[in-house]
Amino acid sequence: MKVIFTQDVKGKGKKGEVKEVPVGYANNFLLKKNYAVEATPGNLKQLELQKKRAKQERQQEIEDAKALKETLSNIEVEVSAKTGEGGKLFGSVSTKQIAEALKAQHDIKIDKRKMDLPNGIHSLGYTNVPVKLDKEVEGTIRVHTVEQ
């Protein structure tokens, strides 16, 4: 019997996959527990529509990330920090501070965990901070650290 998996079933199939399985296994386990539906022409057409919709949504996410990348390349975030002698900062500027400044100054919300700044910013001036906007799209934020 051909079935369309509605959930991942370990060792048998992944969600959205169409597979031939024994009739007893399909009727007594997969269909009964709603792990799969029978592969009728109507269900197959519905599966194709779902795949097409998911592909369009993914494409839209990538386009949105690219638009955000373009926006980020044209702006500058100013972060003030306490400094000591010689322009050295007390502590460092963290990704949390950058995310808060970006939200306050430009009304753009980016998760601090998406910024790649392992040690923080330790000096005054300009720093380019890489940001992972999507699996495929990476941008940079220009951060200007000034004396408080």
From Swiss-Prot:
GO terms for molecular function: rRNA binding; structural constituent of ribosome. Gene3D superfamilies: Ribosomal protein L9, C-terminal domain, Ribosomal protein L9, N-terminal domain. It comes from the Bacteria. GO terms for cellular component: ribonucleoprotein complex; ribosome. One of its GO terms (biological process) is translation. The keyword Amino-acid biosynthesis does not apply. Pfam families: Ribosomal_L9_C, Ribosomal_L9_N. Keywords: Ribonucleoprotein, Ribosomal protein, RNA-binding, rRNA-binding. InterPro entries: Ribosomal_bL9, Ribosomal_bL9/RNase_H1_N, Ribosomal_bL9_bac/chp, Ribosomal_bL9_C, Ribosomal_bL9_C_sf, Ribosomal_bL9_N, Ribosomal_bL9_N_sf. Binds to the 23S rRNA. Belongs to the bacterial ribosomal protein bL9 family. This is Large ribosomal subunit protein bL9.
